[in-house]
Amino acid sequence: MKRLALIGSTGSIGKQVLQVIREIPDAFVIETLAAYGRNRESLISQIREFSPRVVAVRDETTYKELRKLFPHIEILSGEEGLIAVATAASVDMTIVASSGIDALPAVMASIQERKTIALANKESLVAAGELVTTLAKKNHVQILPIDSEHNALFQCLEGRDPSTIKKLILTASGGPLRNKSKEELQKVTLQEVLKHPIWDMGPKITVDSSTLVNKGLEIIEAFWLFGLQAVEIEAVIHPQSLIHGMVEFCDGTILSVMNPPSMLFPIQHVLTFPDRYPSIISGLNFLTNQTLEFLPIDDERFPSIRLAKDVLREGGSMGCFFNGANEALVQRFLSGEIAWYQIVSKLQTLMDKYVVRSCLSLEDILQVDSEARALASEC
């Protein structure tokens, strides 16, 4: 039985993690929970259902309320609480289901304590890929990707000779705006952006999907996650979202992972790895899914992939700057300060002006992130 820490339990991924655990109850126990969002009622329900030993929250009001409701459970708050949840001695696997760089200290602390990492937090690798992967190698810690694309690549690469790998291919649905012209993209509304054709996600990642910055972040994540520096990483539009990732080998063979577009598939794979359990939902029926389309990404309309590859070429602190600036710009769009098309145009302008430096510590990363957000909030 695996003993789990779950960071981000009330978010979209966190709730689906718990859905898998409900269906395979004999395989897992929730030791600790952390929820830093505002979904207080959902967290209370989760505590009652799963009886974790330790719970961490962000705000003081929720902290005080939970202490009254659950006097027998250790309730913590702040960054220290998050780290305590992630590194509890009884935990085997830390599941990082939250988005944003706030989870990075807990990720680093978990690796230091040699916990297996189930990672749905792409920002940790985009902002601090070298630090995270170096520490993981040093401590012999395995990072298992929950993102559907990286999970697909992980399955295709398992047991393969790195010297035989030619290319990694990430697929993208194209987001809610994929069929709009460049002129139409100048006028899109928040309502249009948040109406994703395939995935039900939070607002930030849905905006990232619409700009294809999300796919750019995933290219950077794949670079660090798989450590295949000499291998080309590409992204293609695949509107059906049935193939989630592909690996091309030197002999021309391409392996892929196919399943219906549900995060329950990669979540179950990671939680049960290296074993395989019967799927908790129906798989792919080839007789009813007969069309597979693949389209190139139009750089004129969606330059985010090019920007992500610029990040990899620049190295150093650019990944952290790219991530922090994008997060701030997305928040400005969500609050109505800037138009949708300005997210990437301002991001490119900021990147062009930024002077890359080395990032040797967690403190360096957090400093660059803070600077990026400040600049993106003012431009």
From Swiss-Prot:
Biological process according to GO: isopentenyl diphosphate biosynthetic process, methylerythritol 4-phosphate pathway involved in terpenoid biosynthetic process
Spans through the membrane: none
EC number of this enzyme: 1.1.1.267
One Pfam family it belongs to: DXP_redisom_C
Gene Ontology molecular-function annotations: 1-deoxy-D-xylulose-5-phosphate reductoisomerase activity; manganese ion binding; NADPH binding
Record keywords, A-Z: Isoprene biosynthesis, Manganese, Metal-binding, NADP, Oxidoreductase
UniProt xrefs under PANTHER family: 1-DEOXY-D-XYLULOSE 5-PHOSPHATE REDUCTOISOMERASE (PTHR30525), 1-DEOXY-D-XYLULOSE 5-PHOSPHATE REDUCTOISOMERASE, CHLOROPLASTIC (PTHR30525:SF0)
Identification of the protein by name: 1-deoxy-D-xylulose 5-phosphate reductoisomerase
Species in which this protein is naturally found: Chlamydia muridarum (strain MoPn / Nigg)
